[in-house]
C-alpha cells in the first residue's frame, strides 16, 4: 500500500483545528451580531400593525443614532481644545475681498528696455542730436510767438527770434557733422585693425609656404643624389 492513501496525522490535526475555528467563528457571529429580518421604507400596513411591539422591534425596526459623542458628554470628559476653538470662533457667511483696479500701470520698466535704450544710444547718437535741435526749434518758436503778443517791439523781437533760429539750425548741423565724423573715425579704426590682422596672416602664410618649399626641394635633392649613387 502506498503512503498517499492515508493522510498524515499533521494534516488531520490541521483540518480539525480549521473546523473548530470555523464553528467558533460562526457561533460568535450568530450570538453577537443581529440584523433585522426585513427593512421597509413605506409606512407599515395593517398586518404589521397587528404584531406586538417587541416583535416589530426585533424583526423590522432599526435605530440609528444621529450623533455619537465620545468626549464632552459630562463634566469629567470635556471637549478637546480644538473643538472648543472651532465652536468659539464665529463663522463668517461672506469673505471681504478687495476689488482689483481697473487700470494697471507698470511703474518699473524691465531691464530689457534699458539694454535696448543703451544699445540704441550707442549705435544711433544722431537721434539725440535731432531731438535736441527739435526742442531748440520748438523753444525758439514758442518764444517768437510770445513776443508777437507783447506789443510795439514785435518786429525787432521777431528778427531776433529768426536769428536765434538760424543759429540753432547751424548748431544742429554742426552737431550732426561731429557725430558723423566720430562714427567715420570708429569705422576707419576698425578697418585698420582688420587690415593689420590680414597682413599678419599673409606674412605667416608666406613663411609656412617658404618652409614647405625648402623642405620639398631638399627631399628631392637627397633622393636624386641617392639615385645617382646607385
UniProtKB/Swiss-Prot annotation:
GO terms for cellular component: mitochondrial outer membrane; peroxisome. Keywords: Coiled coil, Membrane, Mitochondrion, Mitochondrion outer membrane, Peroxisome, Phosphoprotein, Transmembrane, Transmembrane helix. Residues 117-153 are annotated as: Disordered. InterPro entries: Mff-like_dom (IPR039433), Mff/Tango-11 (IPR008518). One of its GO terms (biological process) is protein targeting to mitochondrion. Residues 1-210 are cytoplasmic. It comes from the Eukaryota. Residues 229-230 are extracellular. Belongs to the Tango11 family. Plays a role in mitochondrial and peroxisomal fission. Promotes the recruitment and association of the fission mediator dynamin-related protein 1 (DNM1L) to the mitochondrial surface. This is Mitochondrial fission factor homolog B. It comes from Danio rerio.
Amino acid at each position: 500500500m502506498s503512503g498517499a492513501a492515508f493522510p498524515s496525522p499533521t494534516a488531520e490535526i490541521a483540518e480539525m483545528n480549521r473546523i473548530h475555528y470555523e464553528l467558533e467563528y460562526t457561533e460568535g457571529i450568530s450570538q453577537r451580531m443581529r440584523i433585522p429580518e426585513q427593512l421597509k421604507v413605506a409606512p407599515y400596513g395593517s398586518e404589521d400593525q397587528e404584531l406586538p411591539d417587541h416583535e416589530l422591534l426585533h424583526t423590522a425596526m432599526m435605530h440609528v443614532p444621529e450623533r455619537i459623542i465620545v468626549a464632552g458628554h459630562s463634566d469629567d470628559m470635556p471637549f478637546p481644545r480644538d473643538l472648543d476653538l472651532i465652536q468659539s470662533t464665529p463663522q463668517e457667511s461672506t469673505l471681504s475681498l478687495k476689488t482689483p483696479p481697473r487700470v494697471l500701470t507698470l511703474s518699473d520698466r524691465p531691464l530689457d528696455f534699458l539694454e535696448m535704450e543703451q544699445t540704441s544710444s550707442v549705435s544711433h547718437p544722431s537721434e539725440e542730436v535731432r531731438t535736441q535741435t527739435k526742442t531748440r526749434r520748438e523753444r525758439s518758436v514758442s518764444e517768437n510767438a510770445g513776443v508777437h503778443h507783447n506789443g510795439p517791439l514785435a518786429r525787432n523781437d521777431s528778427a531776433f527770434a529768426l536769428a536765434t533760429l538760424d543759429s540753432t539750425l547751424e548748431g544742429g548741423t554742426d552737431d550732426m557733422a561731429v557725430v558723423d565724423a566720430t562714427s567715420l573715425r570708429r569705422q576707419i579704426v576698425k578697418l585698420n585693425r582688420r587690415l593689420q590682422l590680414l597682413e599678419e596672416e599673409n606674412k605667416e602664410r608666406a613663411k609656412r609656404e617658404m618652409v614647405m618649399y625648402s623642405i620639398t626641394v631638399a627631399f628631392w635633392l637627397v633622393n636624386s643624389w641617392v639615385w645617382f649613387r646607385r
